[in-house]
């Protein structure tokens, strides 16, 4: 059926209701069944949107510039499955022009094809829908254009696009009220405007309404918006600069965790008093300069003493940090700012850093109305960034820095580490490269070498720096952006066209490589990392893309990538974090590291736990192999509300991750802004501070990780933690079996008896950042009631073994140990069994062998894993044998059913053959002259015969009526004459009878008037009698004629069936019945025979 016919049929079905663009007045009308066409804008592209009120999810888009149709939306309206849509698009895309759009606004994504191609596909697959037909047949009318959808559009409110697509679309929680209030009208108006902007830019509410998912971004959104509206950027920079350096100084001076928390609280309180919420960033690592964007700035440095003094300062900082690592694990290794001797230079550098940070934070909260102001801010900050980067590069002394474009050309080359195996910087003056003499940074202190090393080396120069200035990209900014989007649209990084990728270098002049692709603030580097496109990542880094720029939710590139599975599928996450390692250790706008988000994703049921575990292992190995202290700093780093990764795992009751982080060195004593430590959170849920879960922390993966970490730092910490007097015995625990994990087996030992468990098993080693089990349990042993929280909603649903490890039972255990010293072991065991029947269950816990000096106390809360393995195996064998028996019986039953089905199929085939022969015989018996080959021919023959029979009936009836017409007329005439004669004879005697009594009445004769009246009355009676008699006779005649006609019909019907009767029909049916069906008809035959008899 052609497309035009489909459209015309659809119009006929709708009573010729033409679809026209609605006017703005119709936008406020209630729901209707007519399609609506509006103009909307997605990613700076105008489209026609067609939908029906109340069914906004069924929408089809058509681009205004070229009339291309989103065919994916058409197939969705036709209710094609995803598999069917994919097959159709793969089949049809080979012969037609198409364009795939990925990323950006969700509703805009899909496959776009020209209008004619869309009509062809709709015609081919017979898709009939008013929305599809309306958008395909729509013609633009300049006099009545479609309205442009406003912000308060119905579609905007009810569209599914407003739903969150990520578990980290966090809800903004309430903040403290400002103590100081202003009474001026301008301040009030500014506050109202700030609240309005804050409501516009407020993140979508999270579906995981848990305490864990309330991110630190809540403390700075409102305050930052007020800063932008009041144009108070100078005060913001100074305040943020002071707070950051105060925190850095506290940590670098070996201050303990309590001092950091007090400093953090004071910052938090001062931030609200000053209408600004400062962000704690003690782990701020400044970007190391790579290539330079501005090549026209003079690079000569007349003062060579600056670089010498700066080199001396670097050595001092590195030596002091290495010496302090043995004493305190919370020190930070901070890259110095450069040899800025004067106070003015330092102040200028601090302002640059503060501006860069504030710029990233403002980009995350500004709306679409402030794009012009943001562009100006971008240009000024970028210019200042490049100038400052040149200053840093003239003085910075980097020993081993890999050349990014070399790894781009040869992906097999590995990146050189910044540090040697001992964790200190190497003081070589040259950069080692694989067969290349190009230097990224040079430490030679003459002017010529500095000029040579400061040039930006490109993949095209390859040592020929003289031709670098001649390279120029002739593409426009829009074409350059489109090229990047084309490369991003490739589903796999291996499909990237290398020639197309090479056209990106160099970027057009004054082009902002950090431009935002979508309305969520993502840069090309964000999507390149999320799509695991390593060649594009390397090219963007070569073009000076800012790896630390955050989107509007505050995520950097690595954080964006962990929400997708592409890096895992492409096996590219290790290489990506080696390129963007700065993102692993630099906090984002939320004050968080990527590791914080991984902890949250580990409890998200929509994420594959194997992928999240793989990401987590890669980050731990990457940080731990370079510097174990750096790994511990990241594990203990607090976000804006003071939560470490260990806090998040404790709040989610994620025992597996909790045990693992404690094993790797995470501290359980750090307090967040709610004055809660991970240990207190675990105790709040009646769980020991060391953590307890179905999987303990001394797994094979963690032991393997410990072997892969730098041996010097690892064994130094092990020797420091081991002391002769603390030979702690670790209770052995059975490890759970996870089918999706790497560890599928565990070394299970025989459970210890009660006599083997002594007091030393409940002690904790004196390692740093560890929790003493005796101290915690003694402090909590006075609690007589269990504590619940929003995480464990119902105490009845809590596993019983978790409650067995409560402080109350610990108090009983300590009392039993003291009684054990006074009484004999046999008597004491009998008494303890009466007092506490669960004691034997708690103390007899099997375990695994593990390093005794590195692990905290572990106690499994799940009693089902404490049973001996032999019992579990016996039960499993019993279940397997029962299942085998049941399956055998089912298989036998199925075999019998198969045999029966095959026999019935063969019988049906025989019956079909018999019926076919009977039909042929019936055709042969009926057909005399012309053969009958099918049922349709037989039906046509029957129709012809019946029509012929009807015509013969009519002819017979007419002949009967003609033969009886004369006789009928004669009979009627005779009857009429008889009636007339009877009337005359009867009228004369009546007159005589009336006239005879007249003379006898003397009174009547004397009155002539009475005589006339009687005569008149008699005449009237006679006339009425005649009329009634005539009507009676006419009615009788009519009835007789009707009976005659019915008799004629009966005669004709009998004549037509003279050769057939009911009995003959029954006999014919009996002859045609097969032997199988004759039994069912015997009863009817017997009834008919008895009735006739």
Swiss-Prot record:
Subunit structure comment from the entry: Component of the transcription complex SCB-binding factor (SBF) composed of SWI6 and SWI4. Interacts with MSA2.
Chain intervals for the UniProt region annotation (Disordered): 138-210, 448-468, 813-855, 973-1017
Basic and acidic residues composition bias: residue spans: 818-837
Low complexity: bias regions: 179-201, 448-457, 846-855
Protein name, entry field: Regulatory protein SWI4
Organism: Saccharomyces cerevisiae (strain ATCC 204508 / S288c)
GO molecular function: DNA-binding transcription activator activity, RNA polymerase II-specific; identical protein binding; sequence-specific DNA binding
PANTHER family xref list: ASPARAGINASE (PTHR43828), REGULATORY PROTEIN SWI4 (PTHR43828:SF7)
UniProt ANK repeat ranges: 520-549, 641-670
Keyword annotations: ANK repeat, DNA-binding, Phosphoprotein, Repeat, Transcription, Transcription regulation
Biased composition (Polar residues): 152-172, 458-468, 1000-1010
Segments of the chain annotated as binding DNA: 71-92
UniProt GO cellular component terms: chromatin; MBF transcription complex; nucleus; SBF transcription complex
Keyword Transcription: yes
InterPro entries with a match to the protein in the record: Ankyrin_rpt, Ankyrin_rpt-contain_sf, HTH_APSES_sf, KilA/APSES_HTH, SWI6-like, Tscrpt_reg_HTH_APSES-type
GO BP field: cellular response to heat; G1/S transition of mitotic cell cycle; positive regulation of transcription by RNA polymerase II; regulation of DNA-templated transcription
Additional comment: Present with 589 molecules/cell in log phase SD medium.
Sites bearing Phosphoserine, chain numbering: 255, 806
UniProt keyword annotation of DNA-binding present: yes
Task performed by this protein: Part of a complex involved in cell-cycle-dependent transcription. SWI4 and SWI6 are required for formation of the cell-cycle box factor-DNA complex. The repeated element in the upstream region of HO (5'-CACGAAAA-3') is called the cell cycle box (CCB).
Domain HTH APSES-type stretches: 37-147
